[in-house]
């Protein structure tokens, strides 16, 4: 064992400096040592000043060099140690896999070991720890929630009291005024006049004891202040509040606008439904079609449907969707549809339209009906809750999954009066930029309008000729009297102007719509500008700007969108570049383009592929084409207009949602809920709150959803209003403390792949995630960028899309966006190269695995495991065991259906598990150490807490510990009892006074030119240096009211999801599992064939072990790096290679096969010869092992028996077999010390007629053990390595032919052979010692005796054991010592005579050997003799077979 070397004292030295000093002084060694499942690489002690929290410790590295947790942390997090280390063969396979991708040994993490005292775990494992933390955080809310699901609401009131505030309606019909809702559970709903203001005008709450109704004082005319919030009572009471989309209702509750979190638990039935019966975006269109079809059928059933409708219903066109069984297992999320799905109840929502009114008197006139409608929603919501909540607990059984919802549903964002300034500035900036571009467009419009009197000019212009110039005629009124001057007719819209100009007006004032006087035309045209709807998004804008694609004018097609016109002689260039040509076949549209025979038209590229239409070439997605000159204009300010459109795109899309945010300022709140410090500067803006209306589980992956804050972009210099997040400001005395989980979902995917090897970094993507660097180009994004020839930043889109299940088509389309000049063939080739390098090749080999699998790529293991998750009957996440929605279960979808969504679910839902664990860990640490903080918001992999200034470093430490616990939980649940140090902690914790992505972002935008002061970012080393300011002291006594109570929480260990999958994959055959891993590693077809051959022909009992050279014995892969085993350790025994065993088996099998038709003594003699030959071969192979077999040789003193091998049509072969006597003697050479006895010499007598000269001479079949053949092969193999394998294959083919021919002949021989009665019982060979038993002997032993065994015709001198019973051969224990040679099964067609009658296809060599040894799988014909021998009869016996799962060769066989 390596003794840790402690650092010398290095005053004022950093950790890195200390490490360099030690290396130069040679105070520790870098040589790896084999010790258990870890190698202790270096033993640097961390050098920190004693005022810090760090302590000295030892660095630990795993078997492939990835740095793990320090010894100090490891002992705290894994008190039991590594109870399930990776097997040596898995380590070797991982090294082989990494070496093939040029990753082995390229470890880069050189950080010193991190060590400090952690809060004690509550239990021995993280699973027990988090179970107890989850139960503690969930109670008493979980108990209340279960009780409320079993309870029933009282009947709804039949009449309502018109009184502001709360009114209680008792069961007996009495009412009480000004009584707040009581109890620990309620169902709640509010109604809002949403077009007038965002505040509630009425609310209803139902409890098991009573009903409550609330009316706004403003609604009843008691005040003109519309900002009325609903009070709910004491915020310290533990209470569950159930509602459908409860986040919307929560924003109307008074007590929620407080820095201190209430004890309310908001349970959203919409979220519960989505988690249990939600649908993915791909399913929604099909479901909507099904819904429409169902509504039509119901309409036809209840009404007298029209003939056309009946024909549609009877025509079967509506039943296509019904084939999708999942349709009946899901619904969309509205309360109406959810109630119909779960309760089969239809809700009338028509009266809801009344709330669209802006006059409160309209509401008052129907107040009773509206209150009844509101109460009905409450009642239905509770009924839905009674169904979905128990189902949710079944789908997401872990207490953490429930407890985390309380915090996710109670997020809060503090703001101040700068919020109003932000909206005003952003809107003004947008209007100013819009006005500037519009002025230029108006100028172009006026310039174009000047051509109305010159048709030659506008018809010859390819852009202007597309405009509709008709409608310029002026209708004249008939003169009333003869001789009167004609006057223009009245009520004409802009007479004298072309139609395209008229279409720009929605409405024209009457004074500007008439005929212009010549001297006032320009003045009137300018006055009309304010009524013209002309922006860069208008259809006419690209024509006014005269846009071109590579110099060719743009043309609008009603059928295909924007296209560009190319002369027909130049069209071939664009066709070769895979631009999409269009054919105008519809006679009703695009007449002009269809008649143009001189040009060819091509669609503008679109990000969604060639089938999508481009409807606006001025969209921000086309800005890169402008910058590259592909898209151009005759006017220089066309690019400016495009940039303006891109700059304002965010504000245009989000302005309404941002303006409609419900901000409640503190001057609207009670004094106890205001947060301005008394010592604050008088200039401090008034503060307020925004409660994001979050749906805690808004997608099938259980991700939170919110329209504004969870989709807000980061501040960009060219985007108006993109500083939105920075407008969230911490109140005085508070800060935001948070972090981004580094590559959260990428790490989850990689650790799922690492689980195959039980080793962090064991698969390529895992290694790149942990150890890859941008500088060396070994990280995932750099590898992808180099393959695609794009930037590293752009490569992230490809990587995450692929991890989420996106296919080759997605990569091709995305690549075209980054490089439009590529042809479709080029993009497909590059994308294919990427997927070959990452996902690998798709392979379907049932002999290796039950379903198709990926192999040879850096991510093959990940995708195989993700698809394994997706294909389960009830898929569950690997950590918390959360189930998939019922609509995506495999039983309800077609095979392979929605596979992308199911793979995406496995990753993203695991990411949600990560977030939930992090939140519950923080909840525990907050209550245990009295931290003054609460969750502010989470955005996927970002988490931000609002903390008091004095506690900011302690909260930062708590975040690091929570993250460490969460990562270890993931590692343990996937089967790896360790954690890399590089991912154990957040790379940085941000401490900031505003909400933004990075603390050093200035957040300068067109609407915010003033930079925002930077925040603070600290890593784990800096936190440790803070000392007591960051210490979570165990001596702190938690507040009694909220202290964790973990002592009496029961815990039952559960079987991890990954363990179940692994056990199912191994299915009791570890060697088959290892072969499957090797198949996933290889990208070579030839190597795959060798693995398949090994699967078919090798015994399934062999085991990999470390040989003396440090390699896995028998592994067919070329080793790239050896395991550095200690030289003092004896080499583990190894098995003979498959090819060598083939040689031994083939020799004995051939002798067995040609002996068919001979008498039993001859068969025994040939068996003995075969065993001796096999032993001789096995001795050579096992010479270097501990258990050496007997060195047996064959001496040719007597010629071998002469046997008839294959029946033929010649007269010689048809003659009866005659007897000749031959004696075969086998002797033992000098035996090894471990041998206890020699092999007895065997003498047998046989009579047969010679049929072949070669066999008469006693020459055996050619064998690889023949010295002459071996010497020749050795010479040839130096120049042709595959020669030996080829020869072995041919010899096996010969053996297969002879054995099958013999099987056919055996039946004929047994019908003509007259056996003699036995004089002694059948002999039983003495049990040989296991170390001296060869594979050939095991194969040639019968596994069972038929019901009517053939009697032995000649007595032998062998001892018999009458009590012995036939047993199934046991596995040979000797492991391999030589590598497996390449082997390809012969595919030559054998003659029909080589098959038995029942056999439908040729047998493999392994089946032939088995057939020769145990009697095969066909009906057997045996000769039975009477006891006296006087009467001879032939009987045909069909044994009663029973199946056995796996035979010696992995095939199902049958035994009697």
From Swiss-Prot:
Residues 1-41 form a transit peptide. It holds the Pfam family DNA_pol_A. InterPro entries: DNA-dir_DNA_pol_A_CS (IPR019760), DNA-dir_DNA_pol_A_mt (IPR002297), DNA-dir_DNA_pol_A_palm_dom (IPR001098), DNA/RNA_pol_sf (IPR043502), DNApol_Exo (IPR041336), POLG_palm_dom (IPR047580), RNaseH-like_sf (IPR012337). Its cofactor is Mg(2+). The keyword Magnesium applies. Residues 1315-1325 have a biased composition (Pro residues). It is an enzyme of class 2 (transferase). GO terms for molecular function: 3'-5' exonuclease activity; DNA binding; DNA-directed DNA polymerase activity. Keywords: DNA replication, DNA-binding, DNA-directed DNA polymerase, Magnesium, Mitochondrion, Nucleotidyltransferase, Transferase, Transit peptide. It catalyses: DNA(n) + a 2'-deoxyribonucleoside 5'-triphosphate = DNA(n+1) + diphosphate. It comes from the Eukaryota. It is found in: Mitochondrion. Its EC number is 2.7.7.7. GO terms for cellular component: gamma DNA polymerase complex; mitochondrion. GO terms for biological process: mitochondrial DNA replication. Residues 1200-1266, 1308-1443 are annotated as: Disordered. Residues 1204-1239, 1346-1371, 1411-1428 have a biased composition (Low complexity). Involved in the replication of mitochondrial DNA. Belongs to the DNA polymerase type-A family. In eukaryotes there are five DNA polymerases: alpha, beta, gamma, delta, and epsilon which are responsible for different reactions of DNA synthesis. This is DNA polymerase gamma, mitochondrial. It comes from Neurospora crassa (strain ATCC 24698 / 74-OR23-1A / CBS 708.71 / DSM 1257 / FGSC 987). The gene is mip-1.
